[in-house]
From Swiss-Prot:
Coiled coil: none annotated. InterPro entries: Aminotrans_II_pyridoxalP_BS, Aminotransferase_I/II_large, AON_synthase_class-II, PyrdxlP-dep_Trfase, PyrdxlP-dep_Trfase_major, PyrdxlP-dep_Trfase_small. Its cofactor is pyridoxal 5'-phosphate. Its EC number is 2.3.1.47. One of its GO terms (biological process) is biotin biosynthetic process. It comes from Mycobacterium marinum (strain ATCC BAA-535 / M). The modification N6-(pyridoxal phosphate)lysine is found at residue 239. Catalyzes the decarboxylative condensation of pimeloyl-[acyl-carrier protein] and L-alanine to produce 8-amino-7-oxononanoate (AON), [acyl-carrier protein], and carbon dioxide. Keywords: Acyltransferase, Biotin biosynthesis, Pyridoxal phosphate, Transferase. This is 8-amino-7-oxononanoate synthase. GO terms for molecular function: 8-amino-7-oxononanoate synthase activity; pyridoxal phosphate binding. Pathway: Cofactor biosynthesis; biotin biosynthesis.
């Protein structure tokens, strides 16, 4: 046989990426990866490790013990070989903690949202989603094949109107409990009332509420609505619990249905045992050390005061609005140069004109660390502060 014929490529099918890259660069919207060292030298005000549990010795030991007993990987789908007693123990303990009847673990909070929304909807359904819902909820709506209505942020009247005018037999309202970009709270009580007026299911992403609101049990529990039969919670194990993975929590019938119907559960490898063991240990620490959620909120209030943010934080998130993405990038870089790492949110994560520094408070911040934050943030924001007002 002769050498294979070489077919010349007139134009690369990926040539369009060059133009897109230039557009992103010119708009200040390029992203990059920056590996962190095992032990950081900067003050961390960017991670979602709200309770400081990712480095807690009990949490690390929980992961190590699970690794020794069950091995490095789950070895398969939960429906084949990837299920362990550890998975089911954590599901039961998480559900009990937030006041739900049952729980189901997923490999991430992202896949938990995909599994819950897509698995509980489909053609002939209506999904009503807040405009600021997390990207995983947005993608779940897109994959659902349901009709989707996106309502203005925290607008209960718009939700009510969308539900009232529907023709679909089934309807679902979708919201974060704590919105990730600005830390505001969803009007859960009012949303649930609207759902009940129109026979709709309420799906709440408690990723930023678990471990912080309601003494750690989440915003729904704080409002006295835990265990409602027409509410499904999703959450992540990667924020307050300092591990990795996600969960859907709600009625037992929902768990049973998702085992049969949630594609991100059926066709994904089960959550690694070490992540399950670490999350289970973190939940134990959260139950035992009840000061941690209050400390997060107190530190968030202090950070907001430092940054002259007028609104009192309702979560671990403190949002410092700067507007221009280049200004936000420069401010974040200046903070890092001075020893403080902060988040920087730009479009498309947030709407155009609302680029911001996103600070996340942690329960374990010391007085010396708070003083460093005060000094650096005050210095850095002296310039950009005028631009954001």
């Amino acid at each position: 046989m002769g050498a294979p014929t070489q077919i010349p490529i007139e134009t690369s099918p990926l040539a369009w990426l060059d133009a897109v890259e230039r557009q992103r660069r010119d708009a200040g919207l390029r992203r990059s990866l920056r590996p962190r060292p095992p032990v950081g030298t900067e003050l961390d005000l960017a991670s979602n490790d709200y309770l400081g549990l990712s480095q807690h010795p009990d949490v690390i030991e929980g992961g190590v013990q699970a690794l020794r007993i069950w091995g490095a990987g789950a070895t398969g789908s939960r429906l084949v070989t990837g299920d362990t007693e550890l998975h089911q123990q954590l599901e039961a303990e998480l559900a009990e903690y937030v006041g739900a009847a049952a729980g189901l673990l997923f490999s991430s909070g992202y896949t938990a949202n995909l599994g819950a929304v897509v698995g509980l909807s489909g053609p002939g359904s209506l999904l009503v989603s807040d405009a600021y819902s997390h990207a995983s909820l947005v993608d779940a709506c897109r994959l659902s094949r349901a009709r989707v209505v996106v309502t203005p942020h925290r607008d209960v009247a718009a939700v009510d109107a969308a539900l009232a005018s529907r023709d679909e037999q089934r309807a679902m309202v979708i919201t974060d409990s704590v919105f990730s970009a600005d830390g505001t709270l969803a009007p859960l009580r009012e949303l649930l009332a609207a759902c009940r007026r129109h026979r709709a299911l309420l799906v709440i992403d408690e990723a930023h509420g678990l471990g912080v609101r309601g003494g750690g049990r989440g915003l729904l529990h704080e409002l006295g609505l835990a265990g409602a039969p027409d509410v499904v919670l999703t959450t992540t194990l990667s924020k307050a619990l300092g591990s990795q993975g996600g969960a859907v929590l709600g009625p037992a019938a929902v768990r049973a249905h998702l085992i049969d119907a949630a594609r991100p559960f059926i066709f994904d490898t089960g959550l690694a045992p070490a992540a399950v063991g670490a999350a289970r240990a973190a939940l134990g620490v959260l139950k035992a050390e009840q000061w941690r959620p209050d400390a997060v909120l107190q530190n968030a209030r202090e950070l907001a005061d430092i940054c002259d943010v007028p609104e009192t934080p309702q979560s671990a998130v403190v949002s410092v609005l700067l507007g221009d993405p280049e200004v936000a990038l420069a401010a974040a870089a200046a903070c890092l140069d001075a020893g403080v790492k902060v988040g920087c949110f730009r479009p498309p994560t947030v709407p155009a004109g609302t680029s911001r520094l996103r600070l996340t408070a942690r329960a374990s911040l010391s007085p010396d660390e708070m003083e460093l934050a005060r000094r650096v943030l005050t210095d850095v924001l002296l310039g950009p502060a005028a631009a954001r007002r």
